[in-house]
Amino acid sequence: MNWKNLVCSVMLLVGITCAEAVNFTPDNVSASIALKVPGNDAKRYPLTLQQLDNSNFEYQWVAADKLPVVIYQNVEEKDGNQRIVIFMTALDDVYFNFGEQVMTGCHHDDCLFYMPGFWYRRNLRSPQEAPSFHTSDSWLVREDRLSTPLTAIFDEKNRKTYSVIRLDNMASDALTTHKEGEVILSGKTSIGYTGFENLSGIASLSFGFPYKEAPKTYIRKLTLAPSVEAYQLLRKGESLSLTWELHESEIADFSECVQHIWEYSYDTNCPQIVNTPYSPEKMKEVMSNFFVESFVGNTPTHYYSGVELRTATCDQTDVAEVGFVGRTLLNAFNALEYGEQQRRTDLVTNAYKIFDSYLQNGFSETGFFNEVVHYRRNFVESVHSIRRQSEGVYALLHFLNYERLQGRKHPEWEKRIKSMLDMFLRLQNKDGSFPRKFKDDFSIVPKIRKQSQWQSQLQ
């Protein structure tokens, strides 16, 4: 069922006519509100649509019990999309969390999901310790985790995309004393939540306010924590308005879905250039201090210190890393290029010292980069990664091309890079892929991952 049929069906339910409203049941749209008294567990109330007559609102969400808050809803047609506008007024002081679900009619197993900057397809390429289908097939997240507060569902079978986007102005947020469970907001927030859920096998777009994250919250890299649900105070007599937009399109494949969603989001949000007090030139000048303050020149391979950096002190550390976080060689190229542009001989000199030291001391016995060296701990990591090795080669190719354009040649580096590319060919699999990790003797380090409950159910 498409959005137009769905919303028109809602209108029929509340007494508004629509020629294309067919096959609607009240289960297509659902909502609930959780109310909390500080110090006590919240109580969730399922809500039901109720028709309104002679009112400024089309319909109202009501519970079986009398609530200290009234919730109205309008559905507005806008450029072929449907805007859901929620109006909420408190009859007494109340801490609340409101949520709504719209079922797409698509089988959840036939769908791929997209939340810009956070979720792609089913996120199965992500580790089990990150948000993915390894943990659950339903996810709700804070809107500010995303590049735009939007969730899209792509039905592979019927080649249709359904999305919901928040349209309110995101102007504020509030602190909490806890990061998980039911949390009381210290003030006003603009941040709601968005996501997708499997409701009895049907994919649904889920959204609400204020934010919550479920079934887990992602607090830092590879760390899933228990879910969180925020409660905001709405004082007696205060009102709140919330707006979301539902959108539907026929799409050929998931790649086109991503492109379409970005274009739709851009057109909807109309982002404007942000005026800043500092010019790009000034910011580059300030950021170039990193090349000065982090440079370590008393080790066999010189490097810029950044791995395991303590932000409280910014003291140099003993870790020299090629690629990934350390990205020493790419930083050296950037410092060289910027240094020559600005006639900064200190940057240029240190950049060449890094390249020269890595040429002499930066390789393993076989000829791969010593990609991570712990100098004070006198330890060189023996397992290589295709990411760091390839990022090192990438940096060197930029360096050699830049030097060639300046009329400078480095035959020893060129010989090294050609040798490394030949070794990469030895590692390459028949399907064109590369092993993620390997040792200096070209033996592959097996990837160990626990099988998720979701994967087990598929077998």
Model-based region annotation:
Residues 1-22:
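Bacterial Sec-dependent N-terminal signal peptides
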Residues 24-29, 36-41, 48-236:
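Beta-strand/loop-rich accessory regions of lumenal/periplasmic or secreted enzymes
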Residues 25-30, 40, 234, 252-321, ...:
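Low-complexity, Ser/Thr/Pro/Gly-enriched N-terminal "stalk/linker" regions
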Residues 53, 67, 77-80, 92, ...:
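Short, solvent-exposed loop/edge-beta patches enriched in aromatic
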Residues 226-230, 310-329, 375-391, 437-453, ...:
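Solvent-exposed loop and edge beta-strand segments that line ligand/cofactor-binding
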Residues 231-255:
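Short Pro-Gly-centered flexible turn/kink motifs
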Residues 329-345, 391-409, 453-459:
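Well-ordered alpha-helical scaffold segments within catalytic/enzyme domains
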Residues 345-391, 412-438:
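Helix-terminus loop motifs that line ligand-binding clefts
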